Amino acid sequence: MLENLSTEHRNEKTMNLDEMNIKEILQRMNEEDRTVALAVEKEIEHIEKVVRVVIQSFEEEGRLIYIGAGTSGRLGILDAVECPPTFGTDDKMVQGFIAGGLKAFTKAVEGAEDREELAEEDLKSIGLNEKDTVIGIAASGRTPYVIGGLKYANSVGASTASISCNKNAEISKYAKLNVEVETGAEILTGSTRLKAGTAQKLVLNMISTASMIGVGKVYKNLMVDVQSTNEKLVERSKRIIVEATGVSYEVAAEHYEKAERNVKAAIVMVLLQCEYGEALEKLKEAKGFVKKAL
């Protein structure tokens, strides 16, 4: 029942929200937002367990799949689509599904979130298997679409996790690992795109970033698998080589081109003073970890 969910409760601090001036509204929102990171902090041990499972999936050439409805689904897609340019992944490695399909990203599809079978259809369409990890996202913790997806994922032997913003969430029963970030009442009653959505975004940031670090997509704190898909990212790639090696911009640019715009290879070439082919071989032996290749 909705009345039992803390995300649906009325916030005692905003009973007169419609009487506040603009500055008061913004200050109250900011005060409430400050509580979100602290709520996430309480779940770090559970988030860590999820990251370990995702890393295992990646190591076995499995995938990370997010499923959700509404804001939760959109946040999953947002995290997924940022992985290729940031970490050099293909677009299959991390994927997001939203109830109602991609058209629901920009316009609500009525009733889609209430149909468990839609998630099963979505996961079947990508050939979900036991190497994959499925993470169900629902602020309320009770969305049928997410429950259906987790049920199907369990049936094929995939790893499962849930992210919700209520304790003892319904979806937690259907996932092997659970992250329950209790964000409490929103300033606008029931509008879980606010604190709950912020919490979900923070957790997704943690999961994808820590998992990519775990499979060698980062050297020191540099995103060395960045894809140079535009002029800004080409410049960033060269700067990463400068930061990682200490050489001049000109030398970094030269090695960047010699390495066929492979930032990792360029770094190894500079630091080991080797040719492109040898750098690739060392990276292959090190399973993509620059530090191990050196």
From Swiss-Prot:
Protein name: N-acetylmuramic acid 6-phosphate etherase
Gene Ontology molecular-function annotations: carbohydrate derivative binding; carbon-oxygen lyase activity; ether hydrolase activity
Domain of life: Bacteria
Listed Pfam families: GKRP_SIS_N
Gene3D superfamilies referenced in this protein's UniProt entry, alphabetically: 1.10.8.1080, Glucose-6-phosphate isomerase like protein, domain 1 (3.40.50.10490)
Annotated family: Belongs to the GCKR-like family. MurNAc-6-P etherase subfamily.
Role noted for this protein: Specifically catalyzes the cleavage of the D-lactyl ether substituent of MurNAc 6-phosphate, producing GlcNAc 6-phosphate and D-lactate.
Annotated SIS domain residues: 54-217
Note: A lyase-type mechanism (elimination/hydration) is suggested for the cleavage of the lactyl ether bond of MurNAc 6-phosphate, with the formation of an alpha,beta-unsaturated aldehyde intermediate with (E)-stereochemistry, followed by the syn addition of water to give product.
CDD domains membership: SIS_Etherase
Keywords: Carbohydrate metabolism, Lyase
UniProt record, GO biological process: amino sugar catabolic process; N-acetylmuramic acid catabolic process; peptidoglycan turnover
EC number of the protein: 4.2.1.126
Organism: Bacillus cereus (strain AH820)
Active site per database record: 82 (proton donor), 113
Catalytic reactions of this protein: N-acetyl-D-muramate 6-phosphate + H2O = N-acetyl-D-glucosamine 6-phosphate + (R)-lactate
Subunit structure: Homodimer.
Pathway assigned in UniProt: Amino-sugar metabolism; N-acetylmuramate degradation
